[in-house]
C-alpha cells in the first residue's frame, strides 16, 4: 500500500517523523483524514489527538494543542503549538489544568482574560479526551 511521509513538530521538538498509511486529526470544521495522494491543503487544526496509522498497521497518537496542517500529495506536516506523544500524556496534570482554567474563567473580568481561560480550558478538555481515546485503544 502507498504511504505518505508525516512530520509532527512543535517549537520544542520533532515528535514524529516517518511513513504512514493514514493520518486523522482535528480540523476547524471537524475530523480530517489524509491518505497518500491527498490534494494540497493548508488549514488550522484544533486541540486534540493526531492518529497516525503506520505501515505495519500500528497506530501512533500525538496530542496537539492547535497549530497548522500542510498537506502535499506525499507529505503531511503538522506544525503544532504544543505536541505531546500519547504515551507521555499525564491525566492528573490535564485534570489540574482544566480545574485551573475553570477557576480562571470564574475570576476574570476582561474579555481577553476570559478568552485566554476558555482557550486553556479547551486544550485541557481535548487532552483529557485524547487520554480517554488512548485508553479505549488499549
UniProtKB/Swiss-Prot annotation:
The lineage of its organism: Bacteria, Pseudomonadati, Pseudomonadota, Betaproteobacteria, Burkholderiales. F-type ATPases have 2 components, CF(1) - the catalytic core - and CF(0) - the membrane proton channel. CF(1) has five subunits: alpha(3), beta(3), gamma(1), delta(1), epsilon(1). CF(0) has three main subunits: a, b and c. GO terms for molecular function: ATP binding; proton-transporting ATP synthase activity, rotational mechanism. InterPro entries: ATP_F1_dsu/esu_C_sf, ATP_synth_F1_dsu/esu, ATP_synth_F1_dsu/esu_N, ATP_synth_F1_esu_C, ATPsynth_dsu/esu_N. It comes from the Bacteria. GO terms for cellular component: plasma membrane; proton-transporting ATP synthase complex. Belongs to the ATPase epsilon chain family. It is found in: Cell inner membrane. Keywords: ATP synthesis, Cell inner membrane, Cell membrane, CF(1), Hydrogen ion transport, Ion transport, Membrane, Transport. This is ATP synthase epsilon chain. Gene3D superfamilies: ATP synthase delta/epsilon subunit, C-terminal domain, F0F1 ATP synthase delta/epsilon subunit, N-terminal. It is a peripheral membrane protein. Disulfide bonds: none annotated. Produces ATP from ADP in the presence of a proton gradient across the membrane. The gene is atpC.
